[in-house]
Amino acid sequence: SCGDLTFELNHARGETEDATWTWVPERKLLSPGDLFIYAVPNAGNPQKVQRYSGEWAAALRRMAALGAEIMLSGHGLPIFGADRIRVALLDSAELLDSIEAQVLALMNTGCTLDRVIHEVKIPQHLRDKPHLRPVYDDPQFLVRNVWRLYGGWYDGEPDNLLPAPRAEQAREWVDLAGGIDRVLERVATLRDEGNLRMACHLVEYAVIAEPGSKPAHALRAEVYA
């Protein structure tokens, strides 16, 4: 406590195993820390330790039940009003729960990580919420994180258990395509068509197969720009 105010510190597992959120009952003020960031929850950062979508969602639901009238989140502007705060917290929890449930259901049918990534869908009524925009984490990153928690590093593709070096793979694919010029021509076409994901795959093979190719590096820079 501090003066007439009580600061209740609550533990949760979210971005880390030791996240803390704070409740000040006298002011009906909630500080969720990074458990709410006014965007898709940061539960899938590609270069961070394991994160816990299910427990994260549970913490958000606990917060929503408090009836806070002021919320000071770890990122973004304050939110005022009990109804607005409750909706924001429960929407975030629903997103996390939905992704985890879909991933587990698909894993239990024997799907590979690739299939899971592309088959999990965000509920339609959550897609356009201003507090769930994918401005930091893409929902596909969250899918990968749930897979890692329950399925480990193996993606379900047998050829990835003991793979050949990627440089060798790249040279084989470029040779099969008829050489690097053919590959770069196709990359440029894909770029112009707006198929940037596939363009990224092919240009990476080109650069890896011939790392000294200036045209390959130049096109790669354009694709990722």
Which residues does each PLM region occupy?
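Active-site HxH/HxHxD metal-binding segment of metal-dependent hydrolases
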Residues: 1
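Metallo-beta-lactamase
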Residues: 6-109
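Accessory terminal helices/loops
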Residues: 65-69, 78-225
